[in-house]
Amino acid sequence: MPRVISDQEKIARFRAFWARSETDRPLIGATIATFPSVRAVRREAGLVAPDDLDIQENLKELDEEWQAWREVMGDAMFVANPLWAFPWHLAMAGCPIKRDADNLWGLPALDDWGQLGRLRFDPDNPWFRRQFEFTHALVRHAAGRYPVGAGQLMLGPVDMMMQVRGQERLALDLYDSPEMVRALGQRCVNLCAAAVHAIYAAVPTHLGGRAGTIRYFWAPGEFVETAEDISFMMSPALHRQFVVPIHRELSQRFPYTLVHLHSAQLHTVPTLLDVEEITAIQITPDFGEDLAPKIPLMAQILERKPLLVHGVMTVASGSEIIRNLPIRGLALLFRCDSPAEAAKVLDSFL
């Protein structure tokens, strides 16, 4: 059984990660591997309404995860997010949310550019009110046992554009209506940032900072994770034109911003490294992917920014990364199928 790391020791390692300080080893942790559960979504199929989300079931599930995993997470910080499987901000933007088996989808909501004015944050929006109710219940229920997060954007403003407008339409809009795409991006940033700030205002800090996002991470101040899955269909030039300004704008509103990438988006790394406002890069390897060919790119990232690798990885793969990369500003979080697997992984490193 691996040593249980205290929250105080975890905080010291998180601070070293963000500051890219010299340390004795990378930040190493283990997290649950499964995709978000939809147990708390009562409607089994079709369009979901705010009242279909079960607060008590969400609390029960989070407690179960905390009890099972809290001693086998290594440096990772358990954090309770309000039903983080749910695309809250898409719903606030007016996208109908559809359940299909265990998946939740946001359907397009912007058929005509004349509807763009509707896309804004409204504290009286029923979806925001429901998220706020979930968050308030989590804070009361956690009672200081574990932190409550508010920084999970699920998609973030970049990918939100694609969901709100629809993938095919947005692909054409990039060429036919570039100014409207920029206006859409700005509204997505405004909505996401305002909603997260409003939730943060209702959540207590944890050991002087904020815990949040699906990475089970902690930062010395407010932070968010955002994604850019949309960039798979963009050239570097289009990425610089439409995506970078959104990342920069969001990062100016939060002191700590983590940009999530898959292998299909790694061509954007050189551009992202030039965006000073982005704090750190996060890479999720595809299932079964050999990360060795990515080590030179990871080294480039670590020269400029902290790097978090979080996903399904073998111990051998993690060991190779540690052997070949500087440890300053490096974090590895292993997704594991069970607490027993997590314990074995951590025993290999800690």
Show where each model-derived region lies.
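Extracellular glycan-targeting catalytic surfaces
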Residues: 59, 118-121
